Amino acid sequence: MRVADFSFELPEALIAHYPQPQRSGCRLLSLDGPTGTLTHGIFTDLLDKLAPGDLLVFNNTRVIPARLFGRKASGGKLEVLVERVLDDHRVLAHVKASKAPKPGAELLLGDDESIRATMLARHDTLFELRFDDERDVFTILNAVGHMPLPPYIDRPDEDADRELYQTVYSQRPGAVAAPTAGLHFDEPMLAALQEKGIEMAFVTLHVGAGTFQPVRVDTIEDHIMHSEYAEVPQEVVDAVLACKARGKRVVAVGTTSVRSLESAAKAAENGLIAPFFGDTRIFIYPGYHYQVVDALVTNFHLPESTLIMLVSAFAGYKNTMNAYQQAVAEQYRFFSYGDAMFISRNPRAPQEKVSP
């Protein structure tokens, strides 16, 4: 399967650089997986598309201000993007510099260069850094870090992004990118869903910077997926099994919830799904048989990305690419701060041939 099969033309003007003034004020493109039928609407229409007893599964990760600017003590400027917090004082990070720091190098971080850190070791593309500070990593990042806006949002981060690039239900700090489908849910919307009898459960997947990495191979099967930490606790497993038992739908909010649930399904030795705590490299592309997820709320994704491949595996390749063409024609807003889709699973998708 070729990566180029997942390409589409996207005018620059359709990339959203700011969210809508109201979280739930975005547009919603609904795709019926079995038929391919498209319906245009607004995000609050989701209330009418869900039935009492359906289960919404959210990702409650919280984005950390993971980007730091500074310099090496020896002089050269650098930019640090924390990928993973290892403990109170150590992190794994991407480092952008004209010359990569060597083990033992001292770094001066923060806009005022008040934070001292030491480069301990290099692990492939990541650098292990230790903050030489009494405060823990999260406190330091909250004090001097910048919100890690995606590379396609071509502007500096602003104070408002600390709230806007964060779901209202986020609880577990550790992500360097927001689970963006969740950005559309505000408190009134969550209250309305509860009032209708929609069940809710929360997984955690700390989204890494790898989510924005382009696929650098020509053939999909050759791609090595980045690793992210996920947790699917027993209460989520129980909620999923209860939902299936009552004949209702498991609706994943975002591709990170999909990857968490399907990782937990793969880990189950007996039964449909089991608790999961660990790193996942699950790579979902056409041909994949979904085990748990029946419907999906998601944003519009980058051409040739692993996420449009995941959606194609869910809705069917032709349905997905047609929906994206329609979204461009109708001028939907794309990517993290853009509009949303609601998709029901196409049971025939795993057998469909991918051909443009």
Curated annotation (Swiss-Prot):
Pathway: tRNA modification; tRNA-queuosine biosynthesis. It is an enzyme of class 2 (transferase). InterPro entries: QueA, QueA_dom1, QueA_dom2, QueA_sf. GO terms for cellular component: cytoplasm. GO terms for biological process: queuosine biosynthetic process; tRNA wobble guanine modification. It holds the Pfam family Queuosine_synth. Its EC number is 2.4.99.17. It comes from the Bacteria. One of its GO terms (molecular function) is S-adenosylmethionine:tRNA ribosyltransferase-isomerase activity. Belongs to the QueA family. Monomer. This is S-adenosylmethionine:tRNA ribosyltransferase-isomerase. It comes from Yersinia pestis. The gene is queA.
